[in-house]
Amino acid sequence: MEYATMSSSNSTHNFQRKIALIGARNVGKTTLTVRFVESRFVESYYPTIENEFTRIIPYKSHDCTLEILDTAGQDEVSLLNIKSLTGVRGIILCYSIINRASFDLIPILWDKLVDQLGKDNLPVILVGTKADLGRSTKGVKRCVTKAEGEKLASTIGSQDKRNQAAFIECSAELDYNVEETFMLLLKQMERVEGTLGLDAENNNKCSIM
């Protein structure tokens, strides 16, 4: 299943970035992405093999074509699809705030990324999904505090503190911090890359090869 939508702005200079969402099964990676790309909430859960999405967003007077790779749910022993990750410039690590195991898996996934890609300086953000359930009256208990998420984020990324992961919580159902999640990653990418390669001649640098 693939989704694609494009929204234009009055920007005159374009650039392109590929990012990937990585996390355990059923943490809401696809739901988050569909909310961002199509502005709708997908309630049913269908295990993802791999999906690709595209959205054009305005960023600092430019049009950014954001290619979003929604990866299959991971566990301790699964291997990442390195071929699919070719060209990825930023990573969104996802866990559910109502699923402790998905949170505990994050350091394992990050180490797996570093080992398989051979680099730890990729722009990365840590995202706690399903924030609406943690504060609802549906009888669902929050299993991971915001403070725990912030602490974990501080341990992810390269040894250069400027490249440490940023942290945010979001809810696809309530459309809470969804746009902000992807913009936060763009800011992380800009910080690492310098200018985000807005000049056409720099547009294809700094990718995973």
Swiss-Prot record:
Its main location: membrane. It is an enzyme of class 3 (hydrolase). It catalyses: GTP + H2O = GDP + phosphate + H(+). GTP binds at G28, K29, T30, T31, V42, Y45, T48, D132, A172. PANTHER family: RAS, DI-RAS, AND RHEB FAMILY MEMBERS OF SMALL GTPASE SUPERFAMILY (PTHR24070). Binds GTP and exhibits intrinsic GTPase activity. Involved in the regulation of arginine and lysine uptake. Acts through the CAN1 permease. This is GTP-binding protein RHB1.
